[in-house]
Amino acid sequence: MLLDEIEAAPRERLHLPWPRDRRLARLAQVLADDPADNRPLEALAARAGLATRTAQRLFREETGLGFAQWRQQLRLIHALERLSAGQPVAQVADALGYATPGNFIAMFKRAFGTTPGRYLRAPQAGGDAAVA
């Protein structure tokens, strides 16, 4: 039921702009497949055949977000899916590559203005929170 509420939330709030450039899309897919991948953009860009500066520029042009913002948005979407499926916060934090649950909770609170636990207990979970 909670997943239904999250899915019913306005799409733009949970929307992740996907890059059109095939090299950048390949890089984005690597992170979507493994959101815990903490490699820096330099390493990911090189693997996709892009210079770091080109990857930075393309991310901004094609998604409207910087790379770090895009990665955080990706992780927030994965976090909401996992939390709504009942996974414990510590497990979600680990699955998303955070060193500690506290680091994950701090990021979540910056984005949604509340902790994951309070967010999930809210009557309209997912309905009123916008990703910052």
Regions inferred by a protein language model and the residue ranges of each:
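Ser/Thr-centric signal marking residues that sit
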Residues: T54, T63, T115
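A short, Lys/Arg-enriched amphipathic alpha-helix from helix-turn-helix/homeodomain DNA-binding modules
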Residues: L3-R39, A45-A48, L65, Q69-P88
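Recognition helix of helix-turn-helix DNA-binding domains
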Residues: G49-T52, Q56
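Terminal helix-turn-helix DNA-binding modules in bacterial transcription factors
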Residues: N38, E42, E61-P101, I105, ...
